[in-house]
């Protein structure tokens, strides 16, 4: 997307802020028009490359929740995560210009001007029960489900499936399954997971590198020796958005 179109999307979203702020029902949940949701999710990729303190990023986060979001900071030598548990979002920032990170840095110790957003993780958390809590990593159970659906994935226009056609976008819902992703995006460029007994294996995952999308799947259908046969019915658990490879 060129700069003028990117600016237009950001402007439209900013103009809609007052509607988002006032669209609260009696239960305290956000009620957002479909067009606004599409603009919001389509703008996710435009956030890549921004600094943690950028106004555009702050604006986007304010649209996702009526409450001010304070992230949990997890820093490592090569990256730092800003985890927004209550809105099902995690942002991975990478250092640039020779900036050196260390493990365990606090927010005030970071040089935000030397960090750029490299990847966006979006979480979809199924209803929790005892068996789910026992079999799911504590880091994942801390997240709530991303609040705005459909999540619109804009697909590369340079790609074609075996029939020579491809939709320009995929509207992802909370129950979108493996077969839905493959039907829209075609066979993945990379995939893995699912090996071993279901109790000890990781879920299957697929990556469409040229679209800048990776999808991890959850549930019993995504694990075990039969995972790739049953995976078509597995619902997504985490979607990662990153810069497409060419």
What are these regions (language model features)?
Residues 2-246:
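A cross-family detector of function-defining hotspots
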């Amino acid at each position: 997307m060129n700069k003028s179109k990117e600016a237009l999307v950001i402007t439209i979203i900013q103009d809609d802020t007052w509607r988002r702020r006032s669209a609260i029902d009696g239960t305290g949940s956000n009620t957002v028009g479909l067009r606004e949701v599409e603009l919001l999710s389509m703008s996710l990729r435009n956030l890549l490359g921004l600094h943690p303190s950028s106004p555009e990023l702050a604006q986007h986060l304010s649209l996702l929740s009526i409450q001010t979001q304070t992230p949990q900071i997890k820093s490592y030598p090569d990256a730092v995560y800003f985890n927004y548990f209550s809105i099902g979002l995690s942002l991975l920032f990478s250092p640039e210009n020779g900036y050196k990170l260390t493990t365990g840095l606090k927010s005030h110790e970071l040089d935000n001007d030397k960090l750029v957003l490299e990847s966006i993780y979006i979480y979809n958390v199924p209803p929790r029960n005892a068996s789910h809590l026992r079999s799911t990593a504590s880091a994942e159970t801390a997240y709530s489900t991303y609040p705005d659906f459909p999540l619109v994935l804009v697909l590369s226009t340079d790609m074609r499936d075996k029939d020579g056609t491809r939709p320009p976008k995929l509207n992802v819902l909370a129950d979108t399954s493996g077969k839905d992703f493959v039907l829209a995006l075609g066979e993945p460029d990379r995939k893995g997971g699912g090996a071993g007994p279901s109790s000890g294996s990781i879920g299957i995952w697929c990556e469409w590198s040229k679209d800048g999308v990776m999808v991890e799947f959850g549930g019993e259908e995504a694990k075990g020796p039969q995972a790739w046969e049953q995976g078509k019915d597995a619902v997504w658990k985490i979607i990662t958005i990153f810069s497409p490879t060419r």
